């Protein structure tokens, strides 16, 4: 199935019907762009996180992990500028009172314009000059001036709500790494270069979330802050671009569905020396940002050092000098990359049986490392349930295993294909034999491959090693 033939509705329907993702708070009418990961979705998303940690922490000679608090001292966000300037350009349609993001209105009507490089005043002027930019709701060109809309969720700590109790849900996980730089370097005795990786929730009060789990107000990030000596940063920037792209390719994303887009100088954040986005060809857009890799220089550590009065310098014993490290940041949205893996894996295969009847097989061709269930154990008859459950219980010590003894074997295969289970293990009467008839058990099972539908006979004792070999990436 070509990428252009896929639609977001196909992905959403599969996710809802098969327990990957449900609308949040659905019995109360839901909550806009709130999604709950169901039984299969939580296993799948956990596997995405495990795959990231495997390559970025476990196998990396440079990186260590961290799990920082979601609610931080509010001075953190004053220092970084989030309190004063982490905002979207908001305007209202005077005719119908609908509220919109100005940059989105400009970008949709004039994609040739680099809206990221425009100030709020420049956006105001551009909209005023271009009457083809109209309200998507009523079609009128009559807007209020742009105003800032801060994206942070504000809350309060303690029993009173005043300015002294104000705090925020973190809008990014990166700052928890920066404020812990000295603690991590001291306790791990790491020398530059080294990185700190974190998986965790972040929150942004987005004006226009949408496209399923692509953009939501509550999301999970997988971020690495890689600290290096100034002057070596661009080499490491290139290293991490390749490393990130290779991770995606190793888990089944096709190279032709990815592109690396370097930011133009006008797009760069003022503190950034270079930024590259790895973009994916989502079915609902031409290209959508998947992974941002940025050279943040020493901006964050310098700001925190100045505001806190605590030294965040690194002593280089080889050169006998003190300096603030530069930082390369590969930042990836877990929910967004999980959606990309689902879009990549979704397939509808048109088949014709021996009688000439046409059929459509829906298959989720997830890499086995990401699949919620690594295998499913299917007894050919319920009379074989005891042996089948014995196999299931043994394999479940090492993998997530499904068990299904309801319906024809063909229908069970199709169910497993649709949820992405890479291998189906069929227990038949040859497996257990028939002592009364003098037929010895062969202690073998039939293993069916999801992608090819090919079947092989295999000893039960070899199942674990066989599946393990397929999970590696």
Regions found by a protein language model. Name each.
Residues 1-473:
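NTP/phosphate- and nucleic-acid-binding module
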């Amino acid at each position: 199935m070509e990428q252009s033939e896929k639609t977001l509705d196909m992905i959403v329907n599969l996710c809802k019907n098969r327990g990957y993702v449900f609308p949040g708070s659905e019995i109360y009418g839901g909550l806009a762009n709130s999604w709950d990961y169901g039984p299969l979705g939580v296993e799948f998303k956990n596997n995405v996180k495990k795959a990231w940690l495997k390559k970025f922490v476990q196998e990396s000679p440079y990186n260590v992990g961290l799990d920082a608090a979601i609610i931080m001292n509010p001075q953190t966000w004053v220092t970084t500028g989030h309190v004063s300037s982490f905002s979207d350009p908001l305007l209202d349609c005077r005719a119908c009172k609908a509220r919109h993001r100005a940059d989105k209105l400009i970008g949709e009507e004039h994609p040739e314009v680099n809206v990221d490089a425009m100030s709020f005043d420049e956006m105001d002027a551009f909209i005023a000059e271009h009457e083809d930019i109209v309200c998507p709701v009523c079609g009128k060109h009559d807007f209020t001036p742009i105003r800032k809309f801060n994206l942070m969720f504000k809350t309060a700590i303690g029993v009173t709500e005043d300015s002294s109790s104000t705090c925020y849900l973190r809008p990014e996980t990166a700052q928890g790494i920066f404020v812990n730089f000295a603690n991590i370097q001291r306790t791990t005795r790491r020398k530059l270069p080294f990185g700190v990786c974190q998986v965790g929730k972040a929150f942004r009060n987005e004006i226009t979330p949408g496209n399923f789990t692509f953009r939501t107000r509550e999301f999970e990030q997988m971020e690495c802050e890689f600290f290096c000596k100034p002057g070596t940063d661009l080499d490491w920037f290139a290293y991490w671009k390749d490393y990130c792209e290779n991770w995606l390719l190793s888990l089944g994303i096709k190279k032709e569905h990815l592109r690396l887009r370097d930011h133009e100088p006008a797009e760069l954040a003022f503190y950034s020396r270079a930024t590259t986005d790895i973009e994916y060809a989502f079915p609902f857009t031409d290209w959508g940002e998947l992974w941002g890799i940025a050279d943040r220089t020493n901006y964050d550590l310098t700001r925190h050092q100045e505001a806190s009065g605590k030294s965040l310098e690194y002593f280089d014993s080889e050169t006998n000098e003190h300096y603030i490290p530069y930082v390369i940041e590969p930042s990836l949205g877990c929910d967004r990359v999980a959606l990309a893996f689902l879009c990549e894996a979704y397939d509808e295969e048109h088949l014709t049986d021996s009688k000439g009847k046409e059929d459509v097989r829906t298959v989720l061709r997830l890499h086995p490392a990401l699949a919620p269930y690594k295998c499913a154990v299917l007894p050919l008859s319920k009379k074989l349930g005891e042996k089948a459950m014995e196999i299931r219980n043994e394999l479940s010590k090492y993998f997530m295993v499904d068990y299904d003894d309801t319906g024809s074997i063909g229908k069970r295969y199709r169910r497993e294909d649709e949820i992405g289970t890479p291998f189906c293990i069929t227990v038949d009467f040859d497996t257990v034999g028939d002592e009364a008839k003098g037929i010895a058990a062969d202690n073998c099972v039939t293993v069916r491959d999801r992608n090819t539908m090919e079947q092989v006979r295999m000893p039960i004792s070899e199942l674990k090693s066989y599946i393990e070999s397929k999970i590696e990436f």
